[in-house]
Amino acid sequence: MQNRYRGTAITACFVVGVVLFLTVGQALGQSSTYQAERTTDGKPNLNGIWQTMNTANWDLQDHPAYPGLPIGGAIGAVPPGQGVVVGNDIPYQDWAMEQKDKNFTNRLTEDPEAKCYLPGVPRATYMPYPFQIIQGTEKMLIAYGYAEAVRTVHLDKENPEPAPIDSWMGRSHGTWDGETLVVEVAGFNGEAWLDRAGNFHGSGLRVTERYTPISPNALMYEATLEDPDVYTRPWTIKMPLYRRLEENARLIEYKCIEFSEELLYGHLRKESGQ
């Protein structure tokens, strides 16, 4: 009797495995040949509200779970996650690696996110909040759920214009490469971090983003970062973006409160002498 059940279980597992293999294969095949719905000017339609499902905002690289402020308990803990860096290596110069380590040590107070500054690019894309793409023929607006950040992608200029001033979000210029929107971003102020683990860049950063539809409700997002003052070579992050499918999905007004953990729990920390 036990052997009969064991044989049935093995057969069931084999069948499930075959089905999953075929399903994954079909999905990968669709992603490489998928053609998105078109806008009135014949371009892939990227309109919608999108969001990542990863832990990149905590740390772009592979990372275990670790605690935050002791008084915050599980609420402030960092979830474990798989990295989104291709090859899992950020090629810092020696001095920059030392700075990154210092940033990590002081992350609870020095991360610009804790101070409600704009997140920069590409970080705005993978923060744990949705963002909306509003696509036009000459301009594209990307509105982010965090801190009401916005940026304009200029599609109407063959030669990118330099940013008039350095800023948190830089200046974005987009072109189409078949099914992929390619966005070149430069003109940063060098103050933003890339995640809560202290990964960072300088004012010489240039980002090349690629938005590629892979199904009706998913985009593949890639961003290549170049900054010869900080990194030894260009490097790339890659992750899927998912469409928010809730009825009447929309961005909700976000009011950022600086150092909210300190405001809520700081008096307890001081009372305990920490």
Predicted regions, residues:
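PEST-like low-complexity, intrinsically disordered acidic/proline/serine-rich tracts
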Residues: 2-274
